[in-house]
Amino acid sequence: MASTVIKNWDNKTWLSSKDYIKSFNKFLLKRIKLDRGSKILDIGCGRGKIIGNLSSKLMLINKPLGIDLTLHKDKDKRIKFKKANALTFLFKNKKKFDLILIKQTIHLFSFKEITKLLNLSKKNLKQGGKIIILSLDTEKNELPTFKLMKIKLKQSLKRDKKILKLITKLYPYKKNRFNFNVKILKNKYLKMIQQRYISTLLPMTNSQIKKGLDEIKHKYKSYIKFKDKLICLTL
């Protein structure tokens, strides 16, 4: 996996809220049929709340496995966690999965790594198993941004488009969209930016972040409303 580490994307944000997780897993289960005996791998799982909820919902016999470069002390207890590089893990792994979930993680890999990742993932699937990839909507993104963040996000989304083209060449897939209505306190969103909740913010200096926070303060009222939009590819 790429060396980029995002520690706070699912730490007390809408992405870790019960409503988001419930809505996302409802969407997910329309893409794939799973049951109590299903085996699940989440690549870039963060704290593992999504697959933890899925484990409870399906009453899974086997704990779903989440891998990430960061070991969080507050990880979900309903999952089995492994701190690992995804490519190394998939190369050495002997078990097969019904679902390999790659949610908002694939952009952290190089194009060469993405090809390896998908080829290895295919080899790690049971017969009839699926890879489900989610990334930011490249066309209709509504994430609240300040000027520099918007520029960097546009650059990142251009690269995401190239990733989608690469995946198109590698494997056939079904494309869907997942949208979630977000209403968040401005102060809470400011804290998320301060904690660099998205990879676009990681290279920025503290002064650039501070300037961006001031822009957001003046740009939005006490609450910020938008749709968090993701593209979903089912391989």
Name each region found by the language model.
Residues 1-36, 49, 53, 132-158, 196:
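Conserved class I S-adenosyl-L-methionine
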Residues 104-105:
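Short catalytic micro-motifs in class I SAM-dependent methyltransferases
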Residues 41, 46-89:
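Class I SAM-dependent methyltransferase SAM/SAH-binding core
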Residues 115-127:
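A short glycine-rich, Lys/Arg-flanked "PGG" loop and its adjoining helix->strand segment in the class I
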Residues 101:
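A conserved beta-strand element that flanks and buttresses the S-adenosyl-L-methionine
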Residues 174-235:
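Conserved Class I S-adenosyl-L-methionine
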Residues 156-171:
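Short alpha-helix
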